[in-house]
Regions:
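Soluble N-terminal domains of membrane-associated systems
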Residues: 1-99
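Core alpha-helical transmembrane segments of integral membrane proteins
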Residues: 115-188
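Alpha-helical transmembrane segments and their cytosolic membrane-interface
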Residues: 76-143, 231-240, 251
Length: 255
């Protein structure tokens, strides 16, 4: 049987753990399963209900009948599949090894304190990936080079604006505009300019919210699933606005 103080400590940690996963792009069912594993390792029954901006978590000690509920804000964090995988594995370790809360907290702090991938490396790999999309859709080597350069400009601008806390809808509009405007340089060369323009903004497509939204709806988490899909749709509209602004400026060159 746990005291109220012990139950509060377990709940506070799981609330931090769950919101970190939700903010990092993990779909809802996985967060619930991971959180309940950690709760089970501490002898606590856990119930979680998540929304777009916050989550409600209730911890219940069956022996004492004590129950505590928290409403916690979900932070906006960069997506890291490696970190999400490590945190999911931690929940299994907690259950299989019967770890005490102090050890679980220690391992969690170590995982979340690990340095992220260097932004320059991310910038270069995103540029190469987008250039590969250009090739996949029929672009030639000149168009690929232009798309690579355009992606570097657009993604670097996105990174800087995110660092300064600019509204994310505005970030997508400006990044799409800058990337497509740079890609419009393809109109001056004998290359597949239309493909270069169209693929220059693909690095902005919000794949994680789209996938998570569908998974959440399929698994019964309708509210957060719909909100994620709506948010992804708004971001796609922002991409279209930025690209449309460029097309209005260079429309004569496309004719």
């Amino acid at each position: 049987m746990k005291t109220r103080q012990e139950l509060t400590e377990v709940l506070d940690f799981i609330a931090e753990y769950a919101t970190y996963l939700l903010g990092s792009g993990v779909h809802t069912s996985r967060v619930i399963r991971n959180s309940q594993r950690i709760g089970a390792s501490q002898g606590v029954d856990l119930q979680l209900s998540s929304f777009q901006k916050s989550t409600i978590i209730t911890a219940h000690d069956e022996e004492s009948g004590e129950a505590i509920t928290r409403v916690v804000k979900i932070p906006a964090l960069p997506v890291s599949f490696e970190r999400n995988s490590d945190l999911s594995a931690q929940s299994w370790d907690a259950l299989d090894e019967g770890l005490p809360l102090s050890e679980i907290r220690k391992r969690y702090d170590e995982l979340t304190a690990k340095p992220r991938i260097d932004p320059i490396f991310v910038l270069l790999t995103v540029g190469l990936a987008n250039a590969s999309f250009c090739r996949l859709f029929g672009g030639d080597w000149i168009a690929m080079g232009i798309v690579f350069t355009s992606t570097l400009v657009g993604f670097a601008a996105k990174q800087r604006m995110q660092a300064h806390g600019v509204n994310h809808f505005l970030i997508f509009i400006i990044s799409a505009f800058m990337a497509s405007l740079c890609a419009s340089a393809a109109l001056r060369f004998d290359c597949s300019a239309e493909t270069a323009l169209a693929t220059s903004v693909l690095f902005l497509v919000p794949g994680v919210p789209l996938i998570n939204g569908v998974i959440d709806i399929v698994e019964g988490h309708i509210l957060i699933g719909c909100s994620r899909l709506i948010n992804a749709l708004l971001l796609i509209i922002c991409i279209a606005i930025g690209l449309s602004a460029t097309l209005l400026m260079v429309k004569d060159g496309l004719l």
